[in-house]
Amino acid sequence: MEKQANVYVNGKLIDTSKDPENLVKSLRIQRRSGKLSPNTSISFNEESNDIHISTDGGRAVRPLVVVENGFSKLTNELLEKVNNNELTFEYLVKTGVIEFLDAEEEENARIAMYNDEITFENTHVEIDPLVILGIGAGVAPYPEHNSAPRITMAAAMGKQSLGIPMANIKWRMDTRGHLLHYPQVPLVRTKHQEILGFDKRPAGQNFVVAVMSYEGYNMEDAFVINKASLERGLGRSTFFRSYESFEKRYPGGQLDKFEVPEKGVRGYRAEEAYRNLGDDGLIDLESEVRSGDVILGKTSPPRFLEEQEITLQTKSQRRDTSVTIRHGEEGVVDLVILSETKEGNRLGKVRVRDLRVPEFGDKFASRHGQKGVIGLVVPQEDLPFTEDGVIPDLIINPHAIPSRMTIGQVLEMIGGKVGSLECRRVDGTIFSGEGEWALRHALENYGFTHSGKETMYDGKTGRKLECEIFVGVAYYQKLHHLVAGKIHARSRGPIQVLTRQPTEGRAREGGLRFGEMERDVLVAHGAALLLKERLLDESDPHEDYVCAKCGEIAIFDYKRGMKFCPVCGESEDIQDNRKIPPVKIAYAFKLLLDELKSMGIDPKLKLKDRA
């Protein structure tokens, strides 16, 4: 007796079938005729003899053209009607011309890439091979020539690139934003870019790129960049940051007020900080501001009711709650808006702009996951030049190409070179872009070698370089990881309330973490004094009295000028340090002792004289 196939719906066994193949076939016919949801998945596993039907959400599905008897159901007649907007995509799905398959059902499908590759064995054909890529990977040219991790990285970094993010950026008040000054459309384009409208909002610029070493300054993915190109506006962008505050209402009819705080107000800053404020407390347009400057002057009533009763709400007891420029930032006031909240309170918003010219440490990336930072800015006259006098904008390291297998970038550079010579844009769409040899022959027609390599001369000595240099045009993106937003140092600053260690992070004027691995290096070197300085003296030093008899933390009675042990009762005058001596420990260690005590563990310290 033939074994019956189990039928599962969303993983739950509901029935069995004697003829599973016919059941699956009839269900698919019903789906294509619109009787079942187009998002239903119907798959048959011959090995386990199971039918799996999925109708639940969260499954990734993709559209494919149905093939019947060796012919695509998407005929030229239908295509023409779609192009003329007579038919919609939804109509093709409803009539079974196109159907959605998930990963499970795709195991039962034989999918052809192109119509002319269809055989009688095929069940589906791709709408177009380029649909396998999403938005991020689709804008990269020749991705089929790159390794998969680089495509993933390129897709991720494309989201971080600077350009013109939206049409109304002139009046937007986003918390932070970037604007590239001279975005260009890429010379090597893809069909994805046309579909997305990328050319209307480009996010990068075409760089003349040379692949060569330059005095070691482009090691480890660093770039050498042309100073004259930067002065002409290459990679130049503006960073925007918005600040806001509103006049809050308090119980008892009190409220905040936008104004220039008077000197008697609690928390008054230096007079210099208020220098750009108008009488209404709002800053003047085009004022230059730096870290700590007030841009929205505001005062608030006292925080506690007792203060009001004692002072009878005198003006001097109001608090300064002004908004200041963030630590480590500066710029020019770009936009000031005075509006109202939903509750009718006055709302002030200020946008500050800061010009960001590319500098050491700024991050750039091609569309092939080749990311790096600027390692050296070189005057144009010192850079190598070609026989035609072309000086590259960017010099990248030859070691960046072979191990990463980003041949797509090599093809893009040749394509960009051809496009600039022929004053046209080259198609680099996946699987259907202009071929390698077509581009090579085009270069030869213009007198260049088909490899893209050129003879170059040293800008400093004028001597001919011994080997030919690969030169081309590549589209590079400036990423929002700019060194001006990350550079940070601290000598002294605020500490945390709980641990008394320096705060963390650039925004809080924090210290630089000296971690376990850094500690191990000093231990290995035997640098004991340096260890003590980093981990104790410059972090959270704390002096406490410890009972020499029982090892408990002692108590200091300030009024009586005595110290005593709460456990064994030992005591002595403040001048004596024999029974209860002062011990220097890290405050974090003292905190640990206190937390152990809170859990019922009583740690004791054993003391001995210094050697």
Curated annotation (Swiss-Prot):
Gene3D superfamilies: 2.40.50.150, 3.90.1070.20, DNA-directed RNA polymerase, subunit 2, domain 6, RNA polymerase alpha subunit dimerisation domain. DNA-dependent RNA polymerase (RNAP) catalyzes the transcription of DNA into RNA using the four ribonucleoside triphosphates as substrates. The Rpo2 subunit (Rpo2N and Rpo2C in this organism) is implicated in DNA promoter recognition and in nucleotide binding. Keywords: Cytoplasm, DNA-binding, DNA-directed RNA polymerase, Metal-binding, Nucleotidyltransferase, Transcription, Transferase, Zinc. Part of the RNA polymerase complex. Zn(2+) binds at C547, C550, C565, C568. Its main location: cytoplasm. GO terms for cellular component: cytoplasm; DNA-directed RNA polymerase complex. It is found in: Cytoplasm. It comes from the Archaea. Its EC number is 2.7.7.6. GO terms for molecular function: DNA binding; DNA-directed RNA polymerase activity; ribonucleoside binding; zinc ion binding. Disulfide bonds: none annotated. It is an enzyme of class 2 (transferase). Binds 1 Zn(2+) per subunit. SUPFAM superfamilies: beta and beta-prime subunits of DNA dependent RNA-polymerase. GO terms for biological process: DNA-templated transcription. Belongs to the RNA polymerase beta chain family. Pfam families: RNA_pol_Rpb2_4, RNA_pol_Rpb2_5, RNA_pol_Rpb2_6, RNA_pol_Rpb2_7. NCBIfam families: rpoB_arch (TIGR03670). Its cofactor is Zn(2+). It catalyses: RNA(n) + a ribonucleoside 5'-triphosphate = RNA(n+1) + diphosphate. This is DNA-directed RNA polymerase subunit Rpo2C.
